Amino acid sequence: MLYPQDFDVIVVGGGHAGTEAALAAARMGSRTLLLTHNIETLGQMSCNPSIGGIGKGHLVKEVDALGGAMALATDEAGIQFRILNSSKGPAVRATRAQADRILYKAAIRRMLENQPNLWLFQQAVDDLMVEGDRVVGAVTQVGIRFRSRAVVLTAGTFLDGKIHVGLNNYAAGRAGDPPAVSLSARLKELQLPQGRLKTGTPPRIDGRSIDFSQCEEQPGDGMPGGVNEGAVPVFSFMGNAAMHPRQVPCWITHTNARTHEIIRSGFDRSPMFTGKIEGVGPRYCPSVEDKINRFADKESHQIFLEPEGLTTHEFYPNGISTSLPFDIQYDLVRSMRGLENAHILRPGYAIEYDYFDPRSLKSSFETRQIQGLFFAGQINGTTGYEEAAAQGLFAGINAALQCRGERAWVPARDEAYLGVLVDDLITKGVTEPYRMFTSRAEFRLQLREDNADMRLTDAGRRMGLVDDARWDAFSRKRDAVSRETERLKSTWVNPRNLPTVEAERVLGKAIEHEYNLFDLLRRPDVGYDALTTMDGGKYASEAVSRETLGELSAPVIEQVEIAAKYAGYIERQRDEVQRAAHFEKLRLPEDLDYMQVAALSIEVRQKLQKHRPETLGQASRISGVTPAAISLLMVHLKKGGFKGFAPQPADGVETVA
């Protein structure tokens, strides 16, 4: 049957990538259909019950700045919040939250059901409708054909998925869900380059069988005994602490020599060590057997016992992801302090699945082979809810823009972690599941959590992603930051008018000549609050008083203070950005035959011919392409007078072919 209504965008899959893709396209005005094998699992947290972390929290803030759902859903579902790296510089501070699985899923479902221009339909997709080199729709498992102008594929671990527990294995998309075998076969027919990856999850434990008196309590920020007692962090720029449910602690235990002995005894039945698993696992979230094998000299590993929610006794033991046989899982869990009588509710397992080489994507995440077909999430070789959500939002945006006949939106590496993520995937590809770290960004001082809205909300508004309420809140914050920064720069402190005792109290010593407040705030040991109490509050501002702006005040002050203290570093980084931008604006001819560029080595020619970079900047980041090779390529292009060798538009976006 051909469904009687046509759509602009079809999104296949209802995980973290799919939900953000569907919401983004619908917010932008596209008639959007979200196809999922089970409406009850929309927004499901398939693995760990947490959102955020180093690098990952930055992505969540960026998704939020563009009107996405993940941060707000986390504020509604978060049962513990922490600011990681709080004692370090602002560039690497990151928010992390434990989330109640049921509350999180409910929040996402509510947002989906209440979003205009968005339709939900429960059916697995078995096939794509392709005419020539363009996708025109999707076909479900019972033969319903939906026509659309673009399709965003966010299949997660479902593509030909296989679960392993010991030497036993079976086909599945995740525990309890069937795999997408037909869809995977169809994609292979389209000759899209693919491979296999794997990920894993730990056994779940009944909290009633845990002796918490033998474990170390880990309260969240704002909880009794935690950092900043009484002040619980907030994830969304539109969120507040009143949205949070009841806050609860996590707990810590450790593996020991007995645990490691048990794990080693199961190596001969491990699918990872016996070759049953072909896919490569995530380097930064290894299985416990991998950790014991690789770090044989380490006597103990920290294990975090994380609550799955407020209405369940289920706990997630973060740190013992495993595919070992269940008898080994049973013994290794019970070998740890506090878990001697633990009851396992669900066994741990590994899952391997198909992914498609992201180097075959355009920088909009549209496939090069099939027009209108976009990929996002684990299908691109990434791991993590946050990476998936960011990609889904990005692909949804560009699918909607293509339907409008507009240029793709591609943030640069100096504009967003999303830009770093996209560029890394399409230029470097993956050899293992990719996760985000702050260390992946060259310009991370500019890419902080606190300024994600300043970097992206304006672009989101222009594309139709940001509603009036968010835009009004953002505009008030932006204007307040600007006004207060200017006030500090134009307010001068004269040593003749400042009592020495006050100067010593706030500044550490008397001043010898006139300074403006902004320059005084640049001093490492001078805080904003102390500065505004100087000389009886004479230098305080009404514009950012807590009485005037309420909760908006803290973010405003934070922005102003960071801008002052890191002004020199930020300015130097901006200079680096400008130098790098030259290459990013130079587009490479689409039809260039790199094998004919005689000045380049065979290796470089082969890599450029395979990857087909869109800009000189992308070419420079391909592994093995040296700065000398880039210089030679520039000479070749200039001598040849190639028409395509021209600057991109000033806003850094590219034309969708």
Curated annotation (Swiss-Prot):
InterPro entries: FAD/NAD-bd_sf, GIDA_C_N, MnmG, MnmG-rel, MnmG-rel_CS, MnmG_C, MnmG_C_subdom, MnmG_C_subdom_sf
GO molecular function: flavin adenine dinucleotide binding
Disulfide partners: none
UniProt: NAD(+) binding residues: 281-295
Keyword tags: Cytoplasm, FAD, Flavoprotein, NAD, tRNA processing
Pfam families to which the protein is assigned, alphabetical: GIDA, GIDA_C_1st, SAM_GIDA_C
Gene3D superfamilies: FAD/NAD(P)-binding domain, GidA associated domain, C-terminal subdomain, tRNA uridine 5-carboxymethylaminomethyl modification enzyme MnmG/GidA
Essential cofactor(s): FAD
Signal peptide: none
One GO CC annotation: cytosol
GO biological process, one term: tRNA methylation
PROSITE patterns recorded: GIDA_1, GIDA_2
Protein family (similarity comment): Belongs to the MnmG family.
The protein, known as: tRNA uridine 5-carboxymethylaminomethyl modification enzyme MnmG
Annotated organism of origin: Acidovorax ebreus (strain TPSY) (Diaphorobacter sp. (strain TPSY))
